[in-house]
UniProtKB/Swiss-Prot annotation:
Highest taxon above the source species: Bacteria
Name of the protein described by the UniProt record: tRNA (guanine-N(7)-)-methyltransferase
Record keyword GTP-binding present: no
One example GO MF annotation: tRNA (guanine(46)-N7)-methyltransferase activity
SUPFAM superfamilies named in the record: S-adenosyl-L-methionine-dependent methyltransferases
Annotated metabolic or biological route of this protein: tRNA modification; N(7)-methylguanine-tRNA biosynthesis
Sorted UniProt keywords: Methyltransferase, S-adenosyl-L-methionine, Transferase, tRNA processing
Binding site residues for substrate: 169, 201, 262-265
């Protein structure tokens, strides 16, 4: 990949080693997920038992999804947990782990951190990584916004957020992972010229991404594809109304070549949904 919107994983910039003090966690957090049952079938339980000790990053606060007090994700932690100082790519919402494990297998020179809150997804990611004997991937079962609040500047080369929970009800849009505050924390966490890659198959979420990111200081949209989107949001079950709304052109990216076609994405395509890809590069704040 040689075009700017498909920055090659192989050539990610070197990261800084600055440390920042972890801010106090708010008493009332807006979560981007709903805690569901963590029951595992026998196969996934065996995977957890066999591979958690190898791949699961011990940064959670007990059985909670909070980040343990005093934890800072920085280059020192990367070197300790991965055993090297290679560039780090963080995937938010790993799901079943298909994409991040495939990326880790294809790029042994890069470290990968998979963030997932649901037990079955964590276990399946452990299973895929363990079966291949990968050494460059770790998994953390924590709330991603909290982790990025305690991530030191320049720690990550890239951040990936593929097919996040769309939270279709308008009253729940504040729970969407793409928010100004999250963008600010990711901007700080990225190395110079690092990128945040986002993908969604929900048109209303694509509009949300543009509203949050396109005018935000410190970010450059590297896209080259023009798409037409409605200028108003629709609520859950009202997606058909979007066709009659005023539309405008927006700039998005070609499909990221480093993202494998997961079962989730296949289902979206089979349902006739359009995939929206975004590549935002962190640039100097004005």
């Amino acid at each position: 990949m040689t075009d700017p919107e498909s920055t090659a994983i192989d050539s990610v910039a070197a990261m800084a080693t600055d440390h920042t003090e972890a801010p106090a966690h708010p008493l009332h957090k807006v979560l981007s997920f709903v805690r569901r049952s963590g029951r595992l079938d026998d196969r996934l339980q065996r995977a957890w038992d066999n591979y958690a000790g190898t791949y699961l990053l011990d940064i959670a606060a007990g059985n909670l999804l909070d980040v343990r007090e005093g934890v800072t994700l920085d280059r020192a932690l990367v070197e300790s947990a991965w055993g090297n100082d290679n560039p780090l790519i963080v995937e938010i919402g790993t799901g079943q782990g298909e994409n991040v494990v495939a990326a880790a297998a294809a790029h042994p020179e890069t470290n990968f951190l998979a963030l997932e809150v649901y037990d079955p997804g964590v276990a399946h990611t452990l299973l895929l990584a363990g079966k291949q004997g990968l050494t460059n991937i770790r998994v953390a079962q924590v709330n991603a916004p909290e982790l990025f609040k305690v991530t030191a500047p320049g720690t990550a080369a890239e951040v990936w957020t593929f097919f996040p929970d769309p939270w279709p009800k308008k009253k729940h849009h504040k729970r969407r992972i793409v928010q100004e505050a999250m963008a600010g924390d990711i901007h700080r966490a990225l190395a110079a010229d690092g990128v945040w890659r986002i993908a969604t198959d929900i048109e209303d979420y694509a509009l949300h991404v543009h509203e949050v990111m396109d005018g935000l200081d410190g970010w450059k949209n590297l896209g080259s594809v023009t798409v037409s989107l409605p200028l108003e949001h629709v609520g859950k079950g009202n997606a058909d109304l979007a066709a009659d709304m005023p539309h405008a052109d927006f700039t998005e990216s070609e499909r990221f070549e480093g993202r494998v076609l997961t079962n989730f994405e296949k289902k979206g395509l089979a349902a006739g949904r359009v995939i929206h890809d975004f590549t935002y590069q962190a640039v100097a704040l004005h």
